[in-house]
């Protein structure tokens, strides 16, 4: 398994480890784990946060003490063979809502056509290459009217094999997906038939990178489905197994999050973890329902209706 095939899957697994660790151990445990991460601050005065329409401003005031919000970036900077090298291959916004007792995972397609401040209209993942987390968050906020200030960025080296430690994940595959995996794995990792299959790490990594059966949006849908399935599987694992896994992966995260700000919220999440597990929402914004393929000077972009995208963010980000 090469590094390119594993990267998107690893970033999803990182989300799982952080959230499930929170459920199982609460604030003190999470605090000790966050201390293992590399801290890299941002200039919060230059993140593209603007005064929003009254409805959003009111909900922001109401939810200020009830939301944990951050964005996760997966960078391909170490993959010299990847056309997306140096850009954010994956962008996932995580919103933990203590009022609704829910977890929203919002993925933004990397080809989304937006205005990158200082660079003009281009793909949203180019912002990471131009200005790393600072410009990436500014781009997201300024285009969609959000107020993200916190992030996690994944260093993929040494993480790809960690998925096997949780025993894989059950997913339903059609025959085309089985054929795709089998063409890219060794004999011992080939899948016998379509249907419900428990994928090991190698198989899952290939499956998560598959954009040839369907398209890039189908791939994102696969990733989100795997994420939810794996979350429920990890939640049933022995606590010591999860602690050991988190020790291995969290040291590979760079962040600016201050866990002390969320002490009370993490304690509440830990106490009601079963409710949160019942309310995991995984969506793509902009959606393919109002997005469209666009070719500009021979380059593919994902265009979309901005008003409808903001409506979706009202629901899944602001909770309106």
Q: Regions from the language model: what does each represent?
A:
Residues 1-9:
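N-terminal Lys/Arg-rich, disordered targeting/topogenic segments
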Residues 8-100, 282:
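Entry/capping segment at the start of metal-dependent catalytic domains
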Residues 44-60, 66-68, 85, 116, ...:
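C-terminal solvent-exposed extensions
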Residues 65-68, 86-91, 100-108, 119, ...:
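Extracytoplasmic
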Residues 79-82, 122-130, 145-150, 209-218, ...:
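Second-shell loop/turn segments in exported
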Residues 120, 132-140, 155-162, 201-204, ...:
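Stable alpha-helical elements in mature extracytoplasmic
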Residues 127-188:
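Amphipathic, coiled-coil-like alpha-helical scaffolding segments used for oligomerization/assembly
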Residues 164-241:
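Flexible, polar/acidic helix-loop-strand segments at domain edges
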